Amino acid sequence: MGHSVEILVPAQRYVFAIENGHAEPQPASTSAEGFKIFKRLRSEGKVAGMVAFPNCCLIRAAEDYVVDPGIIMQGAPTSSSLSARGIEPHTIKKVILTHAHFDHVEALVEFPQREVLVHELEVEAPYTAFLQGVLDMVKIKKLSGDEGEIEPGLRWIRTPGHADGLISLLIDTDDGLVVIASDCVGPLPEYFDEMSLPEDFGPEREELLRQWQRIRELDPHMVVPGHNPPVVLD
């Protein structure tokens, strides 16, 4: 019997714009719509801020793993979502971080003293310095190299571009291979659908396209991006 992947808290974006002299929220029904609003407001010089929830996932294997707990506001919903599945949050022993950007890490405060698997390049990255208080609450297990196995049927590969130590998780399920690609895939779903990024996307453009091709060649049943709904490919 294969493992399973479930979304505990789905991705969403909350964008704020300067309107009438103060910050106002801009409603969006999906994370992708929120990103388009953000791009438009940025071009108009009206962005006041954006908060982005990543997909927080549960992998059910020989052990249960929480993947990318997310920003601090996701902590309570994640715990409630686990409880609704009959899993008490205190029974979760291991958490996996695809990378160590703050929007994927903050809610680790819900899982103190757990073993946290994260690539060593992320632990050493300068942006983790202001998260040190959170990381000090857990037991870091550094992953190294370009690939590895966490347990049979649960592997990881390094997929840099968005972050040098970003890993994608490869999970064997009864429906086929599921890839939790995190922020390797995004920020809009049509980019991955079309395997194309705007020419002015940024310095990571070519690396991301290489990683997308690599993911496609794995022939996955489903890909879970960081900030968009899962994509079923067959």
Go through the PLM ranges and name each one.
Residues E6-P10, C57-R60, G145-D174:
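Core dinuclear metal-dependent hydrolase active-site scaffold
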Residues P10-Q12, D64, D68-I72, A100, ...:
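Active-site metal-binding loops of divalent metal-dependent hydrolases
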Residues M1-A62, Q211-R214, D219:
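Zn-dependent metallo-beta-lactamase
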Residues E106-P112, D234:
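Metal-dependent catalytic neighborhoods of phosphoester/phosphodiester hydrolases
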Residues K36-C56, R60-K94, K139:
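Pre-active-site segment of Zn-dependent metallo-hydrolases
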Residues S80, I92-D103, E110, E115-R158, D164-D234, ...:
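Metallo-beta-lactamase
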